[in-house]
Amino acid sequence: MNKDNLIQNYAVALFNNALLDNIQVTIFEEITLLNRIIEDSFDIKEFLISPIVNKIDKINVINSLIKNTKLNKIVNNFLLLLIKNSRTHILSNIVEAYNKLLYESRNIKIVQVISSNQLQPREQEWIQYRIEKELQQKTALFFDIDNTIIGGIVIKYDNVLRDYSIKGSLEKIAKCLKNVKVC
């Protein structure tokens, strides 16, 4: 099984468990917090992904840490399952896939907007308005900065890429010029 399918399977299983109790958002918040704690602590991360540390030791340490928290039982069991199956290294990917499932369940499309510099709030609102009007669907926009696009924006959602950047335009012009023959 490839890594993407594995990640998706874990995310779907977690989402379906949360759906049974109608606590999808709570579970998302808790696994996001848990992931942030693991990612921010080099020692915890290394401990959890280390093949040298016995799984039983990992489970005992996590159980003692979890005992003092108010994490949902679903999240506790999920983390223990990841440890048991040596999958803690894909937790951040699972959180991302779970987030997508959460948006999809609310009929919200995730859209990534890349610009060469930070966009002003009014620009972000205008872009969101235009995209929602075109897609006829609510969107959740995530803005990233990539100064290599020189100017303009690049919009990504599903398998669609809309390149309105200067870099993209220059590449299209260069491609066309390669096909031009000078007599």
UniProtKB/Swiss-Prot annotation:
Topology term for the membrane: Peripheral membrane protein
Name recorded for this polypeptide: ATP synthase subunit delta
GO terms under cellular component: plasma membrane; proton-transporting ATP synthase complex
Similarity section: Belongs to the ATPase delta chain family.
An MF annotation (GO) of this entry: proton-transporting ATP synthase activity, rotational mechanism
Main location per the UniProt record: membrane
Alphabetic keyword roster: ATP synthesis, Cell inner membrane, Cell membrane, CF(1), Hydrogen ion transport, Ion transport, Membrane, Transport
Subcellular location: Cell inner membrane
InterPro entries linked to this entry: ATP_synth_OSCP/delta_N_sf (IPR026015), ATPase_OSCP/dsu (IPR000711)
Protein's gene: atpH
Assembly description: F-type ATPases have 2 components, F(1) - the catalytic core - and F(0) - the membrane proton channel. F(1) has five subunits: alpha(3), beta(3), gamma(1), delta(1), epsilon(1). F(0) has three main subunits: a(1), b(2) and c(10-14). The alpha and beta chains form an alternating ring which encloses part of the gamma chain. F(1) is attached to F(0) by a central stalk formed by the gamma and epsilon chains, while a peripheral stalk is formed by the delta and b chains.
Role played: F(1)F(0) ATP synthase produces ATP from ADP in the presence of a proton or sodium gradient. F-type ATPases consist of two structural domains, F(1) containing the extramembraneous catalytic core and F(0) containing the membrane proton channel, linked together by a central stalk and a peripheral stalk. During catalysis, ATP synthesis in the catalytic domain of F(1) is coupled via a rotary mechanism of the central stalk subunits to proton translocation. This protein is part of the stalk that links CF(0) to CF(1). It either transmits conformational changes from CF(0) to CF(1) or is implicated in proton conduction.
